[in-house]
């Protein structure tokens, strides 16, 4: 009864909106949509708990104009996604066609390097996501224990790998769909609460921060928070090129809306309650000040975020292995191989320290994919795409060399 007496109108708005969003995202209507099934994988990978840490970090760097930084990051990510989508439609027929040419030989070399870079990044990031999930579980419900946290991480990795090996892609998608449905319901109920908060307390009076080279380095690092859209490229064993392209677009539209809306709406909260720390726990603390119910939901949200992101990257890694071995190793074996490497990393390295290398590897992968798109667009005389890719390449070189890892 004491808790009920503490509930405010905002709490009831959060709870009601959460239930309504949950009914929608887990509805048979969405479940029957093939495009939604394909889009869930890149969406799960893009929206980890990164939106929680990117907001205070952007506000710290850009002040009240953080919304412009987030919009720029989302647009840049969409342009990079455009390079990968271009490769799915235009480069893959050259790469995997029967005709030989100098261009094909060059593209195969660049593609191989990019895939190796991505495989390296996936294997670290999957271990990182689940290791972080384990630390959330023990810090939130038990006492922290390094060995028990690694054991839980190992169990989760083996569960995902063995499930994917035995039940294949569609079972992983089934698990992912429910985790993403819960995660999106929490995120959209958070946005609803922030919308109500802004209705009562909107302010654009935050401080203005100087924009310099350090700001650009941090923005480059934050770009890697919205990575994950590339997983659509590696679903070719089950889905057509057109389906993969549409799924990536849909995932980037939804995630872009979430990231930009969240940054815009949370800015007023930061004006009244400046963030003291640059991590996801700070957002959870501030959300608890907005709504008691929201605070509890956000404590649960990161668990779903880390699990679904790990499943999504496992799917991507399995598809990558299938492609890189010229279809000799199926995706189901790829899932098992990926998670076993993850288990080895959990027990042999500190994944919280080596995640920075994964961030650089993701950036390098995007650079190489853009170079492939640049080469193909030049060959096919697609002038507009060639111009866009020409402008993207130096931006990605800067991010590879100078981007600050958010982790």
Curated annotation (Swiss-Prot):
One of its GO terms (cellular component) is plasma membrane. It is a multi-pass membrane protein. Keywords: Cell membrane, Membrane, Transmembrane, Transmembrane helix. Its main location: membrane. It comes from the Bacteria. The chain crosses the membrane at residues 13-30, 40-62, 67-89, 118-140, 147-169, 179-199, 253-271, 281-303, 334-356, 361-378, 385-402. It is found in: Cell membrane. This is Uncharacterized protein aq_097. It comes from Aquifex aeolicus (strain VF5).
